[in-house]
Amino acid sequence: MFVLNEFTRRGFLGTAAAVGGTTVVTTALGGAPAAQAAVPEAADGGACGARTALVKVDRVDRRYQDLVTRGFNGRFRGRPDVVYVVHTADQVVDAVNQAMAAGQRIAVRSGGHCFEGFVDDPAVRAVIDMSQMRQVFYDSGKRAFAVEPGATLGETYRALYLDWGVTIPAGVCPQVGVGGHVLGGGYGPLSRRDGVVADHLYAVEVVVVDASGRARKVVATSAADDPNRELWWAHTGGGGGNFGIVTRYWFRTPGATGTDPSQLLPKAPTSTLRHIVTWDWSALTEEAFTRIIDNHGAWHQSNSAAGTPYASMHSVFYLNSRAAGQILLDIQIDGGLDGAEALLNDFVAAVNEGTGVEPAVQRSTEPWLRATLANKFDTGGFDRTKSKGAYLRKPWTAAQAATLYRHLSADSQVWGEVSLYSYGGKVNSVPETATATAQRDSIIKVWMSATWMDPAHDDANLAWIREIYREIFATTGGVPVPDDRTEGTFINYPDVDLVDERWNTSGVPWYTLYYKGNYPRLQKVKARWDPRDVFRHALSVRPPG
């Protein structure tokens, strides 16, 4: 069995991109992908005249296959009756009304990076494709930056930075769409410094369907006196496909004052200092591996408060299976920070202390935007995948570290990985009920994945990831229940196994794992704004009762 995993896609590709800057230790890739610049403030019709009319693509249209195969996960392929390509909020209203009149179940796609088959569900008959709604501009009326859901993170970063010098603390993959990323409370390299992206969400425009079955536009803001405020709150981590269709976000940092756009969102760094640290599996004994895991966890337990010198540091530890050849620690920090190089050196030394193994270290410095846009996410055609997640409040136990070693070091052709993301910092300074993103007391975010190409290998790969996940959380029913050690999991890492009692024996329902105590409040929003349960999928917020 030959399988390509996330390490190959992010690890090797990311490493190559990292060392192509102004300070070079090894050779590397070149520049950043092209992205759409900001456009002037515009009404719904667009900044440069009327936008394209609503496009309706059926199964015989030559564009159909391109539109229905945009999903990230090749395990799922939908066959809807129609795909609506929309360009304005009014067109979204029109498309929803047409689908409702035809009795078609609706799903929405922006970037297409959902890990499960929520859009490519066989029951979905109408897909509303948001990819052409991609404007980014400053809205002086709201003193906030408007971003449409079809814009990618890369396009958004480029526009915000080149025109105003600001950014949002969103994800590392520039191809990901803004639409679902923000809805799930997305995070990224600046989250320890600035919080999750939803912490900077001021307002949202949503197309909802009322009890009569008619669609309409609603704007909801964070203002305390806004009668629609709960709808805004639900979009700060409630996840996609629950309440309606987002047609526009507005971003402004809470407490930001004045009318100067350059002061209304976090300033982007001017440069990024990056270290890529690799350990060869051939040199790793179980003792060395578990010591690295222990050191990594202990460091985060001591360095995850807000406002420390490490606030702008982001690291991803790619614990790859032996088939990949290496494990890799990818670290970056604000290159303009005094002592940045020493901070990263100290972090690497702390993680490697007492292992007896000397890792390879590649160092680079490059302009922030170039570094940010260079993290291209490429599956290389290996697009069948399964993902799982967790939040850690404390480091792995000795038993969990041993479980990681046993599964990852096995002589297997399954190329899986367990990725450990630095977390905490500013994220943890926000009360868990202030937004729908409830996990506000964690030090590490975990993403587990297996990725492969051949459908014949589905069973082996699914078994691998399910078994490692269940064993790691064996003492809590096979899942990371909210307790003193773990804090549930991340809705943008959707995992339908959490609904299945074969894999979740904890007695804790899936919605508590994702939303903790915020779920009943989300249900109330659902009841008000989607009373007919038009927007639903396998892990959607259920109507109350």
Curated annotation (Swiss-Prot):
Query: What positions does the entry give for FAD binding?
Result: 492
What does the entry list as the binding residues for aclacinomycin Y? Answer: 451, 493
Family under the similarity heading: Belongs to the oxygen-dependent FAD-linked oxidoreductase family.
How are cofactors bound according to the entry's free-text note? Answer: Binds 1 FAD per subunit in a bicovalent manner.
GO terms under biological process: antibiotic biosynthetic process
Provide the active-site residues from the annotation. 421, 493
Question: What PROSITE patterns does the entry give?
Answer: FAD_PCMH (PS51387), TAT (PS51318)
Gene name in the database record: aknOx
Which named protein is this? Aclacinomycin-N/aclacinomycin-A oxidase
Question: Where does the record put the 6-(S-cysteinyl)-8alpha-(pros-histidyl)-FAD (His-Cys) cross-link?
Answer: 113-173
List, in alphabetical order, the Gene Ontology terms for molecular function in this entry.
FAD binding; oxidoreductase activity
Q: How does activity depend on pH?
A: Optimum pH is 5.5.
